[in-house]
């Protein structure tokens, strides 16, 4: 059972503006979990009986372990666990981070519960993976829960609180990784530990992989799969991705999603050349000026809208879920548009009316983000070169990356700009475009799998007034090695968020609601329950 709230947690939740729904939409635990926790069964609990055993009889394989209290109550509290995770600075500046202390802490959590663990070393010192394996009762292919421990760096001066303190303010827990994705990790781990604490067993092995180098680096999940596939081979995978969206008030659950496809990630480099000279005699052909004009031209341009079967299903569910009639009407206009100009007009209206405009714009088209700019080296010298990197994400089944690249080159033609596709060393542009085409053509994960059915049923039980849908993830995950082998993978961030929290992902003051985390942990508990023996 969950540990009692800390004083800070109680104080902040009392002042929280989180909306709780009425009868039937409270997100309370189901009957078995209630029985497990209730004082009415305290005597039976002392004898090693769990809530499941009260309904279905004992499970002798783990009853003794559960009765012995092998799970620390603090480890089944997702807030307590998340605070510990956030206290470790696992920043990844581009070539991995120091994930060992975080892995050792989490290893201790699993060890206390009697779960087998292994820290997998990589060639980079202290940049490690952690694998925990909960043994199942059959030889069915395992369920893999995939959650990265590394996070992007912070701009400390722009945070309201210490990003490594796990502080709770006004019902929200702040910290780098609170949303992406230590929050999801804490929900998954604490939910599994609740099952173990009950003496529960699973009908297949459950592997929990806390990976490194998801944000960047050479030794992430692909390296791990190449070196140690036997440790992470699975029949299905759950990771980050699907958003739990709220109605316009920002807290009432509206749409629960599980992603089954990621956008296609690639980068473009724009280079400008100009006359280098003394800064006292500026010229219109300066490289920085030329690059700035090109960026200005591109930043005002949107790639065309492309709807795929995955995004059509998502937006149809969104139209049904929202309580905003004007927004629903705009979505239906988009879905029913018969020409490209009509789709573009409807998309503009839909995005303008959305409470999550940047998310919904990203699901429609290839996006461009200007992330790195380099030029100049001395204040009295006009440099001869300038460079900007553009991070791009293409819709699978929409516009091909090669066609987008051609469109960008066409937009800046005649501006003295070179556009290059960033690619791995030793790979030609043609070869890399072929690789991107292959990723672009990867089919979405099947909807008819035990994991997707478990996600759907957990959503219905935990958020009965919200809709559930599959979705496209606008970003990327560590799922590539499994998807390339035809293994279905899905993603969730199991907590309802508002748009401000979504924008803070990889930004400043990253945070999630404490109540949403707890309710999301109940969602994860119910999802794992579908795999109980």
Locations of regions flagged by a protein language model:
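N-terminal secretory signal peptides
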Residues: 1-30, 57
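N-terminal export signals
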Residues: 35-54
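C-terminal region of N-terminal signal peptides and the immediate post-cleavage residues
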Residues: 50-66
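Metal-dependent amide/peptide-bond hydrolase catalytic core
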Residues: 64-67, 243-519, 525, 529-532
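N-terminal helical capping/dimerization or prosegment-like subdomains
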Residues: 64-156, 385, 389, 401-403, ...
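Solvent-exposed loop/turn segments at secondary-structure junctions
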Residues: 92-93, 125, 138, 149-153, ...
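Active-site metal-coordination/substrate-binding segment of hydrolases
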Residues: 140-210
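Hydrophobic, small-residue-rich alpha-helical packing segments that form membrane-like cores
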Residues: 210-236, 240-252
């Amino acid at each position: 059972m969950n540990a009692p709230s800390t004083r800070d947690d109680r104080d902040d939740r009392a002042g929280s503006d989180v909306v709780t729904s009425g009868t039937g939409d409270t997100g309370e635990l189901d009957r078995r979990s209630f029985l497990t926790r209730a004082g009415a069964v305290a005597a039976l609990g002392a004898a090693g009986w769990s809530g499941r055993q009260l309904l279905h009889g004992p499970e002798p394989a783990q009853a003794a372990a559960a009765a012995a209290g092998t799970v620390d109550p603090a480890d089944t509290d997702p807030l307590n666990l998340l605070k510990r995770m956030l206290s470790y600075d696992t920043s990844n500046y581009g070539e991995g981070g120091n994930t060992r202390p975080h892995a050792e802490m989490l290893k201790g959590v699993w060890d206390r519960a009697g779960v087998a663990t292994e820290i997998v070393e990589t060639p980079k010192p202290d940049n490690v993976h952690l694998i925990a394996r909960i043994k199942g009762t059959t030889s069915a292919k395992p369920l893999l829960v995939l959650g990265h421990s590394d996070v992007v760096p912070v701009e400390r001066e722009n945070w309201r609180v210490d990003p490594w303190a796990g502080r709770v303010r006004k019902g929200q827990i702040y910290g780098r990784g609170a949303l992406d994705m230590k929050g999801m990790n804490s929900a998954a781990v604490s939910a599994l530990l609740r099952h173990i604490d009950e003496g529960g067993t699973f009908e297949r092995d459950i592997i929990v992989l806390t990976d490194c180098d998801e944000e960047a680096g050479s030794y992430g999940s692909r390296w791990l799969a190449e070196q140690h596939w036997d440790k992470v081979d699975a029949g299905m995978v759950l990771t980050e991705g699907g958003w739990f969206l709220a109605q316009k008030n920002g807290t009432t659950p509206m749409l629960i999603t599980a992603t089954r496809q990621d956008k296609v990630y690639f980068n473009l480099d724009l280079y400008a050349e100009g006359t280098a000279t003394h800064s006292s005699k500026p010229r219109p052909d300066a490289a920085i000026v030329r690059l700035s004009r090109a960026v200005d031209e591109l930043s005002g341009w949107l790639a065309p809208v492309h709807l795929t079967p995955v995004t059509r299903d998502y937006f149809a569910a969104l139209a049904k879920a929202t309580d905003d009639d004007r927004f629903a009407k705009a979505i239906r206009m988009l879905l029913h548009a018969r020409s490209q100009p009509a789709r573009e007009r409807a998309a503009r209206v839909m995005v303008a009316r959305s409470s999550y405009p940047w998310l919904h714009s990203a699901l429609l088209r290839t996006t461009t983000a200007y992330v790195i700019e380099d030029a100049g080296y001395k204040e009295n010298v006009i440099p001869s070169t300038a460079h900007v990197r553009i991070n791009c994400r293409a819709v699978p089944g929409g516009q091909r990356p090669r066609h987008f690249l051609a469109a960008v080159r066409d937009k800046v033609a005649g501006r003295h700009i070179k556009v290059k596709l960033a690619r791995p060393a030793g790979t030609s542009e043609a070869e890399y475009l072929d690789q991107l085409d292959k990723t672009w053509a990867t089919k979405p994960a099947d909807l008819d799998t035990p994991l997707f059915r478990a996600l759907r049923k957990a959503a219905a039980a935990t958020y009965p007034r919200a809709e559930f849908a599959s979705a496209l993830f606008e970003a990327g995950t560590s799922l590539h090695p499994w998807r390339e082998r035809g293994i279905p993978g899905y993603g969730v961030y199991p907590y309802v968020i508002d748009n401000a929290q979504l924008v803070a992902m990889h930004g400043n003051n990253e945070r999630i609601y404490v109540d949403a985390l707890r309710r999301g942990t109940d969602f994860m508990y119910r999802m794992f329950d579908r795999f109980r023996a």
